[in-house]
Amino acid sequence: MLLHTLNSSPQSVAARDCCTLLTGEDTVILFGDGVYAGLEGSAISQLLRDSGAAIFALAPDVDAAGIGTKLAAGISRIDYPEFVAISAQYPRQMAWY
């Protein structure tokens, strides 16, 4: 059980590596440029969803990117307090940047 935070572009090596290590017991929070990994129809959003991990996207970053209506199904928007609450549940975290 691991929290992955992804704030790099979906085209980055870090984003691909993150997807290869995910399990169904993990959680992913997309923020910064990482929110683009949640775009409906993208290969990486499919990899994320296929992993079985819980996937969240930081709402202020989604809104700033202008992709609020384009997130893939199964990716939940969260605010900053929810980001902190989720982070507090995980003793181990892997930051992908």
What are these regions (language model features)?
Residues 65-97:
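C-terminal structural segments of small proteins and small subunits
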Residues 27-32, 54-61:
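Short internal beta-strands
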Residues 2-14, 32-38:
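Short, glycine-rich nucleotide/cofactor-binding loops
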